[in-house]
Amino acid sequence: MTLAKDIASHLLKIQAVYLKPEEPFTWASGIKSPIYTDNRVTLAYPETRTLIENGFVDAIKEAFPEVEVIAGTATAGIPHGAIIADKMNLPFAYIRSKPKDHGAGNQIEGRVAQGQKMVVVEDLISTGGSVLEAVAAAKREGADVLGVVAIFSYQLPKADKNFADAGVKLVTLSNYSELIHLAQEEGYITPEGLDLLKRFKEDQENWQEG
């Protein structure tokens, strides 16, 4: 079993991912979605957590061998980033969604030197907007951001465009396509549900029609 499939299996088993193609969730953006993901749940399961963190370490060593500092996005990327940094014996920092409105007004907590080669850790990629804002903040502080790693991606076309436009490399441990096919194989969804989930990936606005 590949790592992507193994992680997808864990996410389904521990209910970090819910699939309801016939009774969709409503995202904050108002989009009706057949999937809901809460990767914070992974922290409660040592076997899953270890699989993810070891996967991150291997992925970073392969894709970003020059890394000098690990940064987690607040808040979901912080625990994973801290564990990765510990495993790799690297400095750790975290990036707030916006600067503090008191004290020193920091947006990055920790110490990042000018030109230090950074990898940013996120738990989930939907459109990529929030993590790319974190990347931009890190660059403003002088970091040399090599790329982003995440547990899971919805593989939305908008995310592909956003990362391409920003010139930021993205590496994810598992993804939507891997998960929905595994879910159908293991009986979490029907073949009809799989078709709906495939349609959502291609067209988030009109996937329920037709």
Curated annotation (Swiss-Prot):
5-phospho-alpha-D-ribose 1-diphosphate binds at R96, K100, H102, E122, D123, L124, I125, S126, T127, G128, G129, S130. One of its GO terms (biological process) is 'de novo' UMP biosynthetic process. Disulfide bonds: none annotated. Its EC number is 2.4.2.10. Coiled coil: none annotated. Its cofactor is Mg(2+). Pfam families: Pribosyltran. GO terms for molecular function: magnesium ion binding; orotate phosphoribosyltransferase activity. InterPro entries: OPRT, Or_phspho_trans_dom, PRibTrfase_dom, PRTase-like. Keywords: Glycosyltransferase, Magnesium, Pyrimidine biosynthesis, Transferase. Catalyzes the transfer of a ribosyl phosphate group from 5-phosphoribose 1-diphosphate to orotate, leading to the formation of orotidine monophosphate (OMP). This is Orotate phosphoribosyltransferase. It comes from Streptococcus pneumoniae serotype 19F (strain G54). The gene is pyrE.
